[in-house]
Design a protein with these regions (language model features):
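Extracytoplasmic ligand-binding site segments that recognize negatively charged/polar headgroups
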Residues: 37-48, 59-219
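Bacterial N-terminal signal peptides
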Residues: 6-15
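A bilobed periplasmic-binding-protein/Venus flytrap-type ligand-binding module shared by bacterial periplasmic
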Residues: 134-139, 177-181, 250-262, 281-282
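Periplasmic-binding protein-like
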Residues: 115, 128-129, 159-167, 193-198, 204-205, 273-295, ...
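Short, polar/charged alpha-helical segment
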Residues: 21-57, 133, 284
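A ligand-binding cleft/hinge motif common to bilobed small-molecule-binding domains
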Residues: 90-95, 216-239
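Extracellular/periplasmic bilobal clamshell ligand-binding domains
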Residues: 278, 297-332
Length: 332
């Protein structure tokens, strides 16, 4: 009798969930589309899958991390913010939350994610913007591949490194502070590393996006960048250095906007984005490090790598350290 009752309850709950899903889908279809502002790149496979599976149109607007807050806040204050869903590094969404730009929504699709990924009812973490040393495996000998972050200070890499601007790129600023707090034993050791890296005269670009190209071409040999490009730039001769220290990264977050023009489509899109199907696509086709249990990108060695989510920096900290790094790296 108890088994029959349990089975009945389970079937009833399943029916309710199905009805809720259909209701949301119907409402989203009536709204017509979901607008997605994101700093993440190469997400077209998920956008296409969402459209095919739901019949709801999805529009993707890519905004670089350095311009995200300014663009979003300016549009919001002018009453022209058209995003239904926003995705960016956690510090960026925390800033938007502080401006009242995010709505409360706890997606059922994230029920299996680790508890620490739910910051609150407004922000859900789904991945880590992992940063590593990416090198040209055809031009760098295996014996020369860095084994520690400190190896970047070796004079052999002078004028051979490319990285996002440490004075303005929030994720790079956070990564450098992450090294200070998670890798180096003292501030003196960390400062020695910074000055040694700066002495090697890295090329600075606006964000991670442009970092692989100079390494692919051989103009530079190493990029402080993301392993995902090994997937998205294949068959380019890229590999990542298996350094002894942990790989660090800023948590990637997603949220619905407080004045979403299409609120039901926004919920449907966020649910889809956090689903295992979408996370599989994000990992396997885009190379992202996601937080859905058991899902990893098809990059040799990544599934066993130690990846540490570094803490979020406040806007004041980003500005403070960005200004200091401009001086250390002589950014002009």
């Amino acid at each position: 009798m108890k088994k029959l009752l349990a089975a009945f309850i389970i079937s009833l709950i399943a029916a309710q969930i199905h009805a809720a899903d259909k209701s949301l889908l119907d409402a989203a279809k009536a709204e017509g589309k979901a607008s997605f502002y994101a700093n993440i790149t190469a997400v077209e496979p998920i956008m296409k899958a969402f459209i095919a599976d739901t019949g709801v149109k999805a529009e993707y607007t890519r905004i670089s991390t350095t311009k995200f807050v300014a663009t979003a806040v300016t549009e919001f204050e002018a009453g022209k913010f058209m995003a239904d869903v926003v995705q960016a590094p956690l510090p960026v969404l925390e800033l938007l939350k502080g401006k009242g730009m995010l709505a409360a929504y706890r997606s059922p699709a994230a029920a299996g994610y680790p508890d620490w990924t739910r910051k609150d009812d407004r922000i859900q973490l789904f991945g880590i913007e992992y940063v590593a040393l990416i090198y040209n495996k055809e031009l760098v000998k295996k014996t020369d591949v860095p084994r520690r972050y400190e190896d970047l200070t070796d004079p052999r890499w002078r004028n051979k490194i490319v990285m996002a601007d440490p004075g303005t790129h929030p994720t790079t600023i956070s990564w450098l502070i992450g090294l200070k707090e998670n890798v180096f034993k003292s501030e003196a050791e960390w400062m020695k590393f910074l000055r040694g890296l700066a002495a090697n005269k890295p090329m600075f670009v606006a964000s991670f996006g442009p970092t692989p190209a100079p390494v692919e071409s051989g103009e530079k040999l190493i990029a402080i960048s993301m392993p995902k490009y090994i997937v998205t730039k294949a068959p380019a001769p890229l590999d990542w250095a298996r350094v002894e220290q942990p790989m660090l990264g800023t948590p990637r977050a997603i949220a619905i906007t407080s004045k979403a023009p299409h609120p039901n489509a926004a919920k449907l899109f966020m649910d889809y984005w956090l689903s295992k199907k979408a996370m599989d696509v994000l990992a396997k086709e885009v190379g992202e490090y996601v937080l859905a249990p058991g899902v990893f990108p098809p990059i040799e060695g990544i599934s066993s790598a130690k990846v540490v989510a570094i803490r979020e920096l406040s806007d004041d900290e980003i500005q403070k350290w960005g200004n200091q790094f401009k001086k250390i790296f002589d950014v002009r």
